[in-house]
């Protein structure tokens, strides 16, 4: 278990995009409901996804993230300002591919890793498909009061705003398809 401390910002993509000279990965994320913990097993849809001796508690979001051929199951606790508890487990790609994920809330994005003037790593996500054109940048911090040199291309800060998490965005997409 760890504590994630991050700040998130909208980006106006009509301006220069200096992050595009950086390395990137393509990411697929889907969000699960009904995840259960029983006798050391984290289960969803009758399938054991991971094992852990300690039961994750107060979890608000369960996510599976696919990058290349790696899959990480993440459990996130309730966000309080810029902080949230976070648990992660690697799961085999074969297991992920066997799961019924096509109807789950999901997002696709390209993530660029850009180094700021202060040496902090910014993750700049350019969303795809239904969210094409949306760009969000986030920076992980060691403490909530850590000083950050904000790049000039950042827009509105989203850190404390509800509805801007990737999980919320994925639900918005899923809900819009139910018409």
Locate each region found by the language model:
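Phosphate-end processing signature that detects enzymes handling 5′-triphosphorylated RNA
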Residues: 1-179
